[in-house]
Amino acid sequence: ETVLRRERAAGKRVSCVYVVPNFQNPTGTLIGADKRLGLLELAARHNLLIIEDDPYGELYFDERDAHITRPIKADDREGRVIYLSSFSKTLAPGFRVAWLAAPAALASKLDVAKQAADLCTGSLDQRVVYESWKRGLLTERVPQLRAHYRDKKNAMERVTRSELGDLATWREPRGGFFLWVALPVHLNAETLLARAVREKVVYV
């Protein structure tokens, strides 16, 4: 809200808020339930739209955590949320097929904008996604992906802990692809990058 007031005071027109609520890239941040409702209240007070981008919401690691990724859109009573998601994280990265849920008036305008950008998404990709959905392949695949990425997360934490010890801190992610590691203030990330390049180590 402070940022919003500052931007408007500077004469800038703010009409929407863009948010990735679940396991955001690159920090893996998960927005809590109270803050999600707070965003809806903020949008109502200031007449804003919320663009909710949720490509990772299905990729929580523990079935008991399914509720933590509840879309903001699920509590939208005023038609303020445009919900976006993608099949590229749950089916295959090569299928750049996404979808949205929005009030009809907005959806029709977004449809026109999509056509102006690239006419339409490839028909073959759309057909593969449709058949996968219809045959229940996604229902089978998503739990497998959760287990796969949970195992990769656990392996990454083990290696980070063994190699960096107390030099690194992080909050254990509850889903998604990302593990955000914080280094002590006396370590310079740019210096480490140069060393990583010399050692031919991938550095993000």
Regions found by a protein language model. Give the residues of each.
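PLP-dependent class I/II
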Residues: 1-204
